[in-house]
């Protein structure tokens, strides 16, 4: 893999992470608005619910990023195997 490809993948991954972070932030704001309307903002249960919701959102983000990276690794492995077999078939004597 060339250096440029690695840089582009890194920047793309960071961009996806920023989008996911923005989505989590937006969900958190909606959730906090709902909780502030239904629960007292300084109550113990408000803090507990907020912490659990944050953990679940970050867990979903982590699992999604792991899934995306595994799919990318599988695709790269399959491409490498195809390229290897293509090189071997081209170099074999006829």
Curated annotation (Swiss-Prot):
Regions of this protein lying in the Intravirion compartment: 23-45
Skewed-composition ranges (Basic and acidic residues): 74-84
Signal peptide extent: 1-22
Virion surface-side positions: 67-83
GO cellular component: host cell cytoplasm; membrane; viral envelope; virion membrane
Its membrane topology: Single-pass membrane protein
InterPro entries reported in the protein's UniProt record: Poxvirus_A9 (IPR006920)
Pfam family, one: Pox_A9
TM annotation in the entry: 46-66
Highest taxon in the source lineage: Viruses
Residues carrying covalently attached carbohydrate according to the record: 83
Biased composition (Polar residues): 85-94
Compartment list: Virion membrane; Host cytoplasm
Region (Disordered) residue spans: 74-94
Keywords: Glycoprotein, Host cytoplasm, Late protein, Membrane, Signal, Transmembrane, Transmembrane helix, Viral envelope protein, Virion
Factors inducing expression: Expressed in the late phase of the viral replicative cycle.
Record bears the keyword Transport: no
Family the entry assigns: Belongs to the oerthopoxvirus OPG135 family.
Function in brief: Envelope protein. Required for an early step in virion morphogenesis.
Name of the featured protein: Virion membrane protein OPG135
Organism: Vaccinia virus (strain Ankara)
